[in-house]
Amino acid sequence: MSQTTEKRSRFLHVGGWVAELVLVFVGVYAAFWLNNYQQHQQDAERRDRILASIEKTLREGIESGKINRAEQEREAAEFQRTLDAGEMPPLRPFVFTTDYSPGDFATLLQSGGIQLLDLETRTALRNDESVIRWGLSRMARYQKLSDELIVPNLDQDISFFYDPATKKLRKRFEIYPEALQARVKFANDLERTHTELLKRIQAERQRNH
């Protein structure tokens, strides 16, 4: 075999090896790209499911919250009006019920789901959860005081709760109108943070569609 033929053979061999290497590289890159694309699609679908679920919860909560808040505002305003008029309105058990829980959204966001959301949405979500936690804690405190101070004494004469001379609530029962006002404030705060979070979620969903 001549030197020229040998060089040509060696060149073809090296060329074939390079071509195979390029094909392997292209194949690996294509597989990597496809995997990333599929992962991105899965993340996008998961993010939208999370956002859609939270959006539904918020919409329902805001609507029912408006109805409850209106009733609570009337109750608080009427009690304060009659109290200011010296009519010594009767005290009732303080009750607070809600469908909300700090863990409502946590379940949706477990296993890293929260990392799929925009920073602004995460901030609004944490703010909403903070309002829920703080409000529920305060409502639980008032309900506990009501169960201890008011409920066991509902069969008592009105003078048990009021000073007949001043027609003012006795000191230990002054928490009652405070609790009614706090319940209204919690409802207002909750509607505000729910609305802010809802707007953020709607904006993120629209941007990603």
Report residues per predicted region.
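Long, hydrophobic alpha-helical segments that serve as membrane-spanning/inserting helices
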Residues: 1-15, 29, 36-209
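Hydrophobic membrane-insertion alpha-helices, especially the h-region
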Residues: 18-32
